[in-house]
């Protein structure tokens, strides 16, 4: 602990001029949680013996994957030039799925530390978050992290960073989150450069929610940044988007463990607990005001998080359905962006259709379901929202291939995204080829420094949600990084491909694909199922169809008994009679026989774990 962090300012009595609100923005794995750890240690808010790596990442998944999913806010004391300041650090998620959370966290700050790995340089997410910070008019402090690494090249990347945000390479701070080198200077720079918060102390209270976390003992803990006025304990508050009123049971600051205080005043960042049990009651981005003297206008920038990717979740054991419902209800308490509704599938039984912010969100939810609740699940291939207009001008929103209308269709619209890919210049050709193959439209490219390129495309979201990211990583030796943002909708020539087993449709394998790729999807799925479904006593045709037109077919050969084994030599007519009789029997079986698709075949076919991984 530094001796400069001895005097702690009292919340609610702090002059706004002595407050600094800042966040750290960086690409995944550039070390922002480690830098946050060092700051907590140097300012003494976490004792040496309590310290653990990634102190602010509370979930096991966050610590294992090394990613931050939920924002955290910490108040730290720091002395500079004889004055003592209160620094509020807001730790933000770095992943593209959580861009809305990041934008709200940025709106709660006046400055941002732009952290870049000195061995890796600028990546896609760094740029995306930098643009968000500049949109919010934040003061940006450029910092190179991990300078203790043998592979670090601080001079090269300092020049790159200075070129990106304007300024001299000498202005770029060099720190090491691991060893703590340069962190004191960084805290000084925060005090010097980041402006103090501005707000009207005597106006009606307005606070912006930038995160809310569910605590199993105390209900929802809402993290807020006070913009105007003040709030105190036992005061009645109102949420401006839902008009719901609650009583504040406890209000305080987290440093980093929650510490109750007499209230929060202008510019301060803290938490409030109202005893509400559902996170949807305190929405990220909403404005909190006093119920007795409410503010007139809410703070700008609030939007409802919209799910982008849909997937079906089914328990492998049908009797786990009530547990799955309960688990989703519990996750919903801490994750307001998750939406789900029950659905049934002929093949997979009862389950839920869930909407997610993106693929990482989907992965994290399924991992938490299996880890925290011990559920074994099948997830169907992810799909996006399509707007289908039928011939009689009805517009149908399709989130699941089984909802796709039969009959004549006038047009189909699909969501598109603007994708930015950053990679070394040697991989430009490979990346462009990959994007073109996914129906991408080239927007432009820029060189950032001598050897890094940013390539911009608009692409259908449906093409990204499958295995685009895996292919991008494997074709660029892991160097490329991707960032995307929604960019509206476009009309597309899409069709629904059904898979028929012995003439009967299996709904779990249906998919909405582009007409050009329908044949490839049909042959791949039919071939995959031929390998997975066990042979029956009779021949089973597997067909892929668009409407009534069959586009691909595979046969599973029948298992046949050797009926001629008992004939030693003898007349050909005798043998023929036995073979004809067998043929008749197989024909009869085929009329009445049903094909059971084993559970393993479903899981393998949907996850693509047969031979070479194809497009799902």
Curated annotation (Swiss-Prot):
GO terms for cellular component: plasma membrane. Keywords: Cell membrane, GTP-binding, Hydrolase, Membrane, Nucleotide-binding, Protein biosynthesis. GO terms for biological process: positive regulation of translation. GO terms for molecular function: GTP binding; GTPase activity; ribosome binding; translation elongation factor activity. The keyword Ribonucleoprotein does not apply. It is found in: Cell membrane. It is a peripheral membrane protein. It holds the Pfam family GTP_EFTU. GTP binds at residues 29-34, 145-148. Required for accurate and efficient protein synthesis under certain stress conditions. May act as a fidelity factor of the translation reaction, by catalyzing a one-codon backward translocation of tRNAs on improperly translocated ribosomes. Back-translocation proceeds from a post-translocation (POST) complex to a pre-translocation (PRE) complex, thus giving elongation factor G a second chance to translocate the tRNAs correctly. Binds to ribosomes in a GTP-dependent manner. This is Elongation factor 4.
